[in-house]
Amino acid sequence: MTDPTSVVERRVVATSGGGTVTVFELGSGPILGVLHGTAGLDGPTAAMEDLAADHRVIAPCLPGFGSTPDEPSLRSIHDWVVALSEISDAAGITGAPWLASSISAMLALELAAIRPEAFASLVAVGPTGLWDADDPGTDLYAVSLGEQASLLAQNTSTLGVLAGDPDGLDGDELIEVGVSRYIRRRTAASLVWPLPDHGLAGRLHRVSVPVTLVWGADDRLVPPSYGERFAGLLPEATLAAPIAGAAHLAELDAPAEVAAIVRLRAPAGA
């Protein structure tokens, strides 16, 4: 018998705004929405595969982050929040618990501030969106590409196309990978550079669902100290202990630990 967690469905869905989004699905059980971090999404991650043992994991790839094409019309944080709302509906994750990372966690919080029913609960891994000039973290775009990868994940092999080994690729494949990396970096930069502050601090009080904040202990992009800042602004927040050995994208460095937190906050039997 085929293990249901090993069967990955990839589909392309149309949003109400006229765009299309690639969605990965695996596992069986209650729906869990998963939003990727800065590296983008090329297929199921280890955390997704873990959670698929008792959830129907549904993970859309946001525009410009891999298998979903770049969308030039997304020029402001408002554009992105509207797009995420449409993507959520099209992917079938509206109202379900979510796991979101980095910039996607920021967008999820922005969405919840104006659409409370967007998700039932959120596990937010290293969310961007706040800024403290006295505790700024490392500027991802002020370091080399190699340093960028190590800032995102201790285990850079988990970053997929963004930092994969190009050996063995032919000329056309090298071009394709290079273009994809450029678009991902440009898209991510548009959301967090030069500053990640789009006024989220003034809207977090509107987030009415439970939020669990998760940080990698070695996150130098959004330092773990920001967890207290987020927790102090959210009406219903739980701050988990920082995960040792994990950088910014803790769900990639510590998939089992993050999956365990998700199960605690969104149990499959609930």
Regions inferred by a protein language model and the residue ranges of each:
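Short alpha-helix in the alpha/beta-hydrolase fold that links the catalytic acid
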Residues: 47, 200, 209, 223-232
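Conserved alpha/beta-hydrolase catalytic His-Asp/Glu region
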Residues: 149-208
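Short beta-strand/loop motif that positions the catalytic acidic residue
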Residues: 207, 213-215, 219
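Acidic catalytic loop of the alpha/beta-hydrolase fold
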Residues: 218-222, 248
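Catalytic histidine-centered segment of alpha/beta-hydrolase-like enzymes
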Residues: 246-255
